Amino acid sequence: MEEFRFLYLIYSAAFALCLVVSVLAQDQSGFISIDCGIPSGSSYKDDTTGINYVSDSSFVETGVSKSIPFTAQRQLQNLRSFPEGSRNCYTLIPIQGKGKKYLIRASFMYGNYDGENGSPEFDLFLGGNIWDTVLLSNGSSIVSKEVVYLSQSENIFVCLGNKGKGTPFISTLELRFLGNDNTTYDSPNGALFFSRRWDLRSLMGSPVRYDDDVYDRIWIPRNFGYCREINTSLPVTSDNNSYSLSSLVMSTAMTPINTTRPITMTLENSDPNVRYFVYMHFAEVEDLSLKPNQTREFDISINGVTVAAGFSPKYLQTNTFFLNPESQSKIAFSLVRTPKSTLPPIVNALEIYVANSFSQSLTNQEDGDAVTSLKTSYKVKKNWHGDPCLPNDYIWEGLNCSYDSLTPPRITSLNLSSSGLTGHISSSFSNLTMIQELDLSNNGLTGDIPEFLSKLKFLRVLNLENNTLTGSVPSELLERSNTGSFSLRLGENPGLCTEISCRKSNSKKLVIPLVASFAALFILLLLSGVFWRIRNRRNKSVNSAPQTSPMAKSENKLLFTFADVIKMTNNFGQVLGKGGFGTVYHGFYDNLQVAVKLLSETSAQGFKEFRSEVEVLVRVHHVNLTALIGYFHEGDQMGLIYEFMANGNMADHLAGKYQHTLSWRQRLQIALDAAQGLEYLHCGCKPPIVHRDVKTSNILLNEKNRAKLADFGLSRSFHTESRSHVSTLVAGTPGYLDPLCFETNGLNEKSDIYSFGVVLLEMITGKTVIKESQTKRVHVSDWVISILRSTNDVNNVIDSKMAKDFDVNSVWKVVELALSSVSQNVSDRPNMPHIVRGLNECLQREESNKNY
């Protein structure tokens, strides 16, 4: 009876253990299993492994889904392709967090999904380090890359880099948590690249993986020709082994047929920097207690040097030997039977990894979290994927970072100019504690300038121009600015108080609104009286009542009389220029220099252009667009009064009508100013506006050679739901006019971009738009393309009058922007935000490069 009870307890314990193992085997809490390219939100359970796969839609922001018609394995039937961007990234956030070890596996099958019959080649990155290069030799080949990785942060970035040798893609991405024992698969650099993993037995049967292997390691059957398989039907335990080997793998072993022969294996190593990490797994599968006088004992050696002597595997228990040989051209492993052994050596399983340097730390965690938060809160539409600062060739657009081999990279500069930011200035900026330059200009930011910006002790440039910020500026920022050690740019924020004195004490807060109310009432009464006097005077100034434009009733702009215009221009004494609309005169209004555009009576299109320009200028306000001061319309006399630009227009400068030749830096700044004005028309106006007459003569310069886009006589609004054509009336200036508008009989924002591309080419070359000879007419774009094709040297197209104090790479960048803008394929033309970013980067390059 006692014997029966004992057996019952044994079987009960064994059954309970089996239940525990089964539950653990089914636990996928440490798994992230992604079938790339399947429909968003979808998932399924694999019939063979029982692994739950999900769509990649919540792990990646870019790419397009593609499918392969004929493939057996379900995880290879779909893929995600990345035709755009130099780097695209998946973000994995395992629940176990950072400082843990994970097995990460990426799989690829080309399957000629794109019909190109190509051999795509691209780079694979993990965090800020190169993982491997993926090369698909044909459509049916399957490539799998695997790494054991010690995570540095909560987020794990797996990225694909475009090498220009085919479109990157990925079929499957898998992550497996390897338990809490970080001594398992230990590596000095935090990463082990998979080389091979063998289940040493006969070649019959399939690879072993989950749920037989709790970590979903894939074990490939392998047998040496001089060996045979031995096995057991009993389970092999790994209770005291942190590698948690599969019982199915460990229940088979390989042993030499010739019992006196050793087991040998050789690794060829052509790279002296490569270090192999070898894991040999042993378990005795024969019950030697049933074989009297039989023993199994052997030595383990590397290149003839014994590293483990007299080793005897334990029956049905896993033992692992970790071997880390010195790097040599040939590494020979041997399992040699000892003299007292009666049985040959055995080995059950083998893993080989390569230890490579993952020496580059990720971007400082606080910095990375800050810009990631900004990306989310402002919905930043930039190619911001993966680690912000790494690898260096893939740094996030608009960022600069500092690099130190001993510490993680830090973000030192952030340019979010013209990025469509709205709302308040985010507190996340306060976490960029090493930031030196911050540009938030040309956005829609509102509210106060927060005090925390003054606490960023390394900040030396802060640009907040052209937003809608209100309130007073923190006194510390103003004080730092006054010392000259800090550049603070606050222009074009009408509601912003920039004087220290405007920060009043609390005792005055109740007085100010009361005084302001009385003052406002007084001003209102005064203006009413002035308005009545002006109206009576205007009614008497001409015999017939003036035809007041309907726009004057709806827009709060000053309507002048023709008599006022005669006075301010000194009876039209100084002509500034002439055009199809009429003549522009110089004048003064309240000691302010103005330009008066008088519409010609003979201009057939004049009144339409006049009305269009007034409609545009009374509703758009931007630092890079000419500002309307007023207008007049009496009888046949009509015109505009706008701010005077002292340095004329860009066309005259390029034509050599001024003594000073503009430098490349000045031209870049002018191009950027004009681009920002055009970007505002396209992206900042509701509804958007197409200019339709972008040219160098419509880019005006002030005394500091800062530019504003002018002449909106041909401008038209267009609606976002039907932007393909704005107007069926083709208008503009030959040479700048998009040739495709005659095919489509319409103009749109891409037509403006074509014109701006021509402007850029003029600025680069100093050439006229069209060069005419007796035999032909050559457009500047055709000339540039011809020269670059024949010489591939951008210096051959640069304006010879310009000083050679420039970075040739920035010129190349602008040439590329210009040529893409004038592309005959409209879809290849960039939009204005892209052009603005490109010009901004070029200007920053010029300003930071002091050693030409």
From Swiss-Prot:
Q: Which Pfam families match?
A: LRR_1, LRR_4, Malectin_like, Pkinase
Q: Where in the cell is it found?
A: Membrane
- What membrane topology term does the record carry? Single-pass type I membrane protein
Q: Which residues carry this modification: Phosphothreonine?
A: T561, T728, T733
* InterPro entries (alphabetical): Kinase-like_dom_sf, Leu-rich_rpt, Leu-rich_rpt_4, LRR_dom_sf, Malectin-like_Carb-bd_dom, Prot_kinase_dom, Protein_kinase_ATP_BS, Ser/Thr_kinase_AS
Listed GO cellular component terms? membrane
Q: Which residues carry this modification: Phosphotyrosine?
A: Y642
Residues in compartment: Extracellular? 26-510
Is Membrane one of the keywords UniProt gives this record?
yes
Please report the residue spans annotated as repeat (LRR): 410-432, 434-457, 458-479
EC number(s) reported in the record: 2.7.11.1
- Whether Cytoplasm counts among this entry's keywords is no
Q: Tell me its family.
A: Belongs to the protein kinase superfamily. Ser/Thr protein kinase family.
The protein depicted here goes by the name Probable LRR receptor-like serine/threonine-protein kinase At1g05700
Organism of origin: Arabidopsis thaliana
